[in-house]
Amino acid sequence: MTAALQALLDPTALSLGLPTPAINKEEYLAICLAALACTRAGKALVGVGGQQQVQACNKWLCPAPAAPEELRFRCTVCGKAFASYQALGGHKSSHRKPPSPGDHYGAAAAAQQLASAGDSKEDSASSAAGSTGPHRCTICRRSFATGQALGGHKRCHYWDGTSVSVSVSASASAASSAVRNFDLNLMPLPESTAAAGIKRWAEEEEVQSPLPVKKLRMSN
């Protein structure tokens, strides 16, 4: 039975998948009893070579727990450890994954929303400053708190329904539209020629004038 049990529990035959030797009924029952004994904390079997049978049964039915793998390779990004360098490389590829187009568009939309929010805040601040700012008179440059006060003040600048600024602009336009009897593009005449021309023009005016006063001047 011992030889049959050793042949049945041979690790080389088990690893290579070799066919087990034929055993009879008594040997099979003995192997079953040995397996039951292994499950009860390795009690010794009765008979010659019982200790060897227990050790072989323990190796086959109660294998030693596998030693835990040492995690020597650690990711520098997230701190996870891996047993092999290949596993670490496969994990690091997830950190180098480029962002999807949806994420890019989402980030661009968020930036645009932030920019539009900043512009709206600036516009609201400028409009509030303009509405609460002083109202200044365009004539005397005085400032007033409200538009009604400015309108009441402007009444002092008006006489008979006309504005001082309008009258000043009208007088300036009239002065600029006055006709001058000389051309700036021509060379100036000598004083003798200019005096002779003026005297001649005066004589022609007196001759052609129908007024009696000028005729008396001609007779004199």
From Swiss-Prot:
Superkingdom of source: Eukaryota
Gene3D superfamilies: Classic Zinc Finger
Keyword Zinc-finger in record: yes
BP GO annotations: regulation of DNA-templated transcription; response to oxidative stress; response to water deprivation
GO molecular function list: DNA-binding transcription factor activity; transcription cis-regulatory region binding; zinc ion binding
UniProtKB keywords: DNA-binding, Metal-binding, Repeat, Stress response, Transcription, Transcription regulation, Zinc, Zinc-finger
Region (Disordered): 90-134
Gene Ontology cellular component list: nucleus
Coiled coil: none
Zinc finger (C2H2-type): 73-95, 135-157
SUPFAM superfamilies: beta-beta-alpha zinc fingers
UniProt-listed InterPro entries: AZF1/2/3-like, Znf_C2H2_sf, Znf_C2H2_type
Comp. bias intervals (Low complexity): 107-117
The keyword Repressor is assigned to this record: no
Induction: Induced by abscisic acid (ABA) and hydrogen peroxide.
Protein task: Probable transcription factor involved in abscisic acid (ABA) signaling. Required for the regulation of the cross-talk between NADPH oxidase, hydrogen peroxide and MAP kinase in ABA signaling. Regulates the expression of the NADPH oxidase genes RBOHB and RBOHE, and the MAPK genes MPK1, MPK4, MPK5, MPK7 and MPK14. Regulates ABA-induced hydrogen peroxide production and antioxidant defense. Required for tolerance to water stress and oxidative stress.
Note, other: Plants over-expressing ZFP36 display enhanced tolerance to drought and oxidative stresses. A natural allele in the promoter of ZFP36 in the durably resistant rice variety Digu confers broad-spectrum resistance to rice blast (Magnaporthe oryzae).
The name this protein goes by in its record: Zinc finger protein 36
Organism: Oryza sativa subsp. japonica (Rice)
Lineage of the species this protein comes from: Eukaryota, Viridiplantae, Streptophyta, Embryophyta, Tracheophyta
